Amino acid sequence: MQFITVALTLIALASASPIATNVEKPSELEARQLNSVRNDLISGNAAACPSVILIFARASGEVGNMGLSAGTNVASALEREFRNDIWVQGVGDPYDAALSPNFLPAGTTQGAIDEAKRMFTLANTKCPNAAVVAGGYSQGTAVMFNAVSEMPAAVQDQIKGVVLFGYTKNLQNRGRIPDFPTEKTEVYCNASDAVCFGTLFLLPAHFLYTTESSIAAPNWLIRQIRAA
């Protein structure tokens, strides 16, 4: 019965935008930030590597490879700070952000985890001197924690910070990413967001990370990058 209740809750809310975005009227530079698909790392030239690379995994039901909520909020703030000196990359196929993988033991599919790992590896091989930061929202947090925890030390060292919104394995992982420094991890979990406390019940609080993804999280990532 609990599974059915959770499944129905997920289905009912899947079509809703996970977070209402709150961005300024886009300038010429910021226009690209509103795109739900970002492949700067994949398409970028190694001879023109930026100082910063953001890798993000969207929530279940979100479009593109970035979504149009937490991912674009974080990207917009970082691009305002670093202007043309940052690449933004979403985690795409085979991560399709479907609902059912939330019920898997890892909280997502192995294919999704492997694709995120491929992005971190690509950043390390293509732009080894860039500061890499990452983030995930809802199911995207499961994609990120699994990928980051499985990366070799050299790749983990390049990752300066990871932000997680509505962390679906927050309780199970005790508010951290296993085998990754706690000082490089920042978890944003609203007090009434049930997914942060060992369930998959979606309450309104799960969709209320606009301020965190627009201000608190990018500011923390900027500090992490500057301190590296």
UniProtKB/Swiss-Prot annotation:
Q: Where is this site: Transition state stabilizer?
A: 60, 139
Coarse class of the protein's main subcellular location: secreted
- At the top of the EC hierarchy, this enzyme's class is hydrolase
Keyword Zinc-finger belongs to the record: no
Family annotation (SMART domains): Cutinase (SM01110)
Q: How is it modified after translation?
A: The 2 disulfide bonds play a critical role in holding the catalytic residues in juxta-position; reduction of the disulfide bridges results in the complete inactivation of the enzyme.
The residues annotated as the active site are 138, 193, 206
Residues that carry a glycan: 190
Q: Name one GO biological process term.
A: carbohydrate catabolic process
| Gene Ontology terms: cellular component | extracellular region
User: Is-annotated flag, keyword Glycoprotein?
Assistant: yes
Write the record's keywords in alphabetical order, separated by commas. Disulfide bond, Glycoprotein, Hydrolase, Secreted, Serine esterase, Signal, Virulence
Mention one GO molecular function: cutinase activity
Location in or out of the cell: Secreted
* SUPFAM superfamilies assigned to the protein according to its UniProt record, in alphabetical order: alpha/beta-Hydrolases
Disulphide bridges:
49-127, 189-196
Q: What is its EC number?
A: 3.1.1.74
Gene3D superfamilies tied to this protein = alpha/beta hydrolase (3.40.50.1820)
State the signal peptide span: 1-16
- Listed name of the protein: Cutinase CUT1
